[in-house]
Amino acid sequence: MPNVSVKVKWGKELFKDVEVNTDDEPVVFKAQIFALTGVQPERQKVVCKGVTLRDDSWANFTLSNNALVLVMGSKEEDLPSAPVEKTKFVEDMNESELASALELPEGLINLGNTCYMNATVQCLKTVPELRNALLDYDQSSGGGTAGGLTAALSNTVRAMDGGGAGACAAAAARLLQALHAAAPRLAERGPGGALAQQDASECWTEIIRALRARLFMPGTDNKSMIEKYFGGTLDVEWVCSEADEPTTKSEESFLQLSCFISQDVKYLQSGLRSKMAENITKMSESLGRDAVYTKTSKISRLPAYLTVQFVRFYFKEKESINAKILKDVKFPLDLDVYELCSPELQERLTPMRNKFKELEDANVESSLAARNKNQGDNKDIRKKKLMPYWFENDIGSNNSGYYRLQAVLTHRGRSSSSGHYVAWVAKGDDWLRCDDETVTPVSQDEVLKLSGGGDWHCAYLLLYGPRVLEVPDEDEPMVTDVTEDVAKDPPTALA
């Protein structure tokens, strides 16, 4: 009988009619207990009829209707409250009070080495088109494990939009279960039976793969939303260095670019460039043996959202681990990939780039004119409109080559299977650090310090979104002394 109603006793508190589905993993039940008691799953000891519940199995833990389940464990912060209500300053607030005061988004509870999943979700959630598609997803549409993972992510996004800590905990537990079903390797456990730490890049890839199969563009012939907004193409040429062979041309698709970290790479841009021209040994039909080829790649389509992976891990055979390269590689808040593009794409990017340049020049002139004024502060402010960031015939593309950083996924530790993953996401002009369930404001300078070089958090995955051109709306009348909130999502082609 998978569905039962039980009583949960924690200290002096008794929670009646708690619905439990034993088809779910035990971690889902522990997430429910967290929602009721505030006790983190890793601090819980759950007992029924003298049997302790394990994290990975319901074995010997039999539940029946009205069974009494005992929970032992304390909250991380069981501090006595002050007897008198008094004004609190930001520096005196705890994490929950700070989140409420600053209207911070919900975090996701760590269910036992699940920080890699939490950080991935927080980064992907910054894409408004993806978030909207998940909120609109038909969870009854099936689709096997990919459909189950997409539905679970949809539920998680809904819970994070005001559902509260309890709803987020339960949603995260079901998301973990769906992730394990779609990618069983991520369900590996350590010697003690606890969930093993996983590579966040693998989690990112698995989630994107599922979304690619289940999210489609409205009004199209089942075109993948992921391919349109995250996918690009490369024009590739192969030239043999050892024989006079004809140049071989092909086209390759990508969902992310890689920045390989060598001794000479100090900046993201140089790491990306080095990947675009590389020597590769492969079989030569004319020579009848392996030969060295020069592979040259140029981007022929830019996606709206560009994912970049720092290739920081390599297999260390002696210790059988994916060891980490700690080298400092700087990355910018604003990224221009024009030089990585094919001549044909560069020509198509030029008109929008010229508009950016014209606006920047006009802003400089206005600033200089304002400084030279000897009169009051009154300004004429024309209402603004946001220009589309995509080509008219290619929704989900980037029409300028300009990007702005909107999420960073970092790793702290010495191997991909250990340490800790955290998401750092942009909110308007500000930044937030999403460390599992704890969300705190940080500065841009703190984000730029994530470039590596030590044991602090190192950038592992970067997510860049399109820079959106904001121009005066010529159809709107001139107004005076108007202040507008310009911290808004970019225009989207998805309804």
Predicted feature locations:
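UBL (ubiquitin/ubiquitin-like) substrate-recognition surfaces
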Residues: 1-495
